[in-house]
Structure formats: structure tokens, C-alpha cells
Amino acid sequence: MSDHKKAILAGGCFWGMQDLIRKQPGVVSTRVGYTGGQNDHPTYRNHPGHAESIEITYDPAQTDYRALLEFFFQIHDPTTKNRQGNDVGTSYRSAIFYVDDEQKRVALDTIADVDASGLWPGKVVTEVTPAGEFWEAEPEHQDYLERMPWGYTCHFPRPDWKLPKRADAKA
């Protein structure tokens, strides 16, 4: 039996999210897809209400959910509603789809730390909602930037971005 855990995050175009998150220590695998919408079996051309998302399988002996969330908040702008870079619409919203109550607690705590830190110019608008069905995207979207390294992305690591705990954050 595997001790691996799952996380489902949305923060703009799934290509850039996957490219950066898959390289993080403790991440075992990733796949991009759609979740949080109205229709079953969504596709790139038909995914009303769904967010472009990434399902992350990680080894909790090497990383934890909090570390994944801190990196997630570093690589996308969680203060813009339904937008990342040039991508606009609910497909590109910032969202955390939690799989259990502990993930929900950690997500809300991390958001409070991000808000208190002043690292972003506004308040976090990231949705925190229970995970529903995750629909894997078409094969051409999987590991897209690994195959097309000069392809489109709006995600960038911010190397000096370090999230302090609330007690250490600016008032």
C-alpha cells in the first residue's frame, strides 16, 4: 500500500503549474486536468465552470502539504480573481481543492499567513473547496512544457519569496 498523498490545485494555465510543481522535492507525479465545474468528462474545448488544475501525488516523508501550498502561492498571483497573466476566466481561477479536513485547515492557515505577510499587493482570493471529481486533460496537455520548453507560461518562481509564519509577519 502506498503512503503517497494527493493535492489538487488550480492557479492559471495548468501547463506552467505542472512544469514547476513536478520539479519540487517529494513530488512523485503530476497530471493536469479539470475540476470544480458542471459537466462530466470535460475537455479543453468544453469545461464550463471547471478550473484548469493539477493533481499532485507526493511523498509525505519528503515534503508536506504546507510546503506545496507555499510554493503554489509563490508561483502564481493569488490576489487576482479569475485571471493569471493574459489568461482570463473562471478556468484560470486560483483554487485549492482539499481532500480532507486537515488539508482544509492547512489551506486556510496558509492563506492567513500569505495575507498577513504583505508579500502580495492585495488579499488572497483563492477558493478553498472540497475536491470533487478530477478529470484528466487530454494527452497533449500532459507535461506540455517538458515537451515544448519554449511554450507559453505565466508562472515564475520568485526566489526571494519566503512566507513567514503569522507571528513573524508584518502587522
Curated annotation (Swiss-Prot):
- UniProt protein name: Peptide methionine sulfoxide reductase MsrA
Q: Name one Pfam family in it.
A: PMSR
Q: What is the annotated signal peptide range for this record?
A: none
Key word Protease present in the record? no
Active-site residue list: 13
- GO terms (BP aspect): protein modification process
What this protein catalyses is: L-methionyl-[protein] + [thioredoxin]-disulfide + H2O = L-methionyl-(S)-S-oxide-[protein] + [thioredoxin]-dithiol; [thioredoxin]-disulfide + L-methionine + H2O = L-methionine (S)-S-oxide + [thioredoxin]-dithiol
This entry's Gene Ontology molecular function terms read: L-methionine:thioredoxin-disulfide S-oxidoreductase activity; peptide-methionine (S)-S-oxide reductase activity
